[in-house]
Structures are given as C-alpha cells and as structure tokens.
Amino acid sequence: MSFAGLNDADVAAALAACTAADSFNHKAFFAKVGLASKSSDDVKKAFYVIDQDKSGFIEEDELKLFLQNFSASARALTDAETKAFLADGDKDGDGMIGVDEFAAMIKG
C-alpha cells in the first residue's frame, strides 16, 4: 500500500463500507482510514499519491479512481460520487482540488 502509517484493517473496513454504488462518503472514509488524524505532512503525502499525473491538482478523473489508490481491486466512484467529492473539495471553483483544499477537506 502506498499510504504509510495507515492501518490495513482500517483501510479494508473503510473500503468495505462503500462497496455499493453511491455509498461513498469522503468524510466518513477519511475518518475510517485514519487520514483525518494524520499530520499535515502525511496528508500532503496522500495528496501526491492521489495526484496520479503529478500536476499539483487532483482532477475529476483522478477522483473517480480515488478508492483504487487504497486497493487496486476497489471500484471506481460513480459520476454522482465524483462530482459531490469535487464540489466539496474545490473551494476556489477551478474544477480541481489543490493540496491546501485537500488538506482542508480531510481535516474539516
């Protein structure tokens, strides 16, 4: 797993809780995997793992594959889940989530 410091059992439980389509809630997921209690540096490391193209932003296509960063066999997010995730994180309205927006979303 590419997220050092997260408990594998917590990650597995968080993934199991959102296997059904439209059951993903990013706030609940962040809390279950333990990201919400991590340091700012750890949150930034998580951001850079999710930012697959290394653009400095998490775009909609990267959000769709969010769960697969935690487990290759996890499902893709639905369009509705992806749009809700993006809408909550994208505070400046540029259609992407920057590292500070991501940190605020996890800690919020």
UniProtKB/Swiss-Prot annotation:
Keyword terms: Acetylation, Allergen, Calcium, Metal-binding, Muscle protein, Repeat
UniProt xrefs under InterPro entries: EF-hand-dom_pair, EF_Hand_1_Ca_BS, EF_hand_dom, Parvalbumin
Domain of life the protein comes from: Eukaryota
Residue sites binding Ca(2+) 2 per the record: D90, D92, D94, M96, E101
Residue numbers bearing the N-acetylserine modification: S2
Residue ranges occupied by any EF-hand domain in the UniProt entry: 38-73, 77-108
Annotated coiled-coil segments of the chain: none
Keyword Amino-acid biosynthesis: no
Residues reported to bind Ca(2+) 1: D51, D53, S55, F57, E59, E62
UniProt cross-references to SUPFAM superfamilies, sorted A to Z: EF-hand
One Gene Ontology CC term in the entry: axon terminus
Function description: In muscle, parvalbumin is thought to be involved in relaxation after contraction. It binds two calcium ions.
Family membership: Belongs to the parvalbumin family.
Name recorded for this polypeptide: Parvalbumin beta 2
Biological source species: Salmo salar
Record lineage: Eukaryota, Metazoa, Chordata, Craniata, Vertebrata
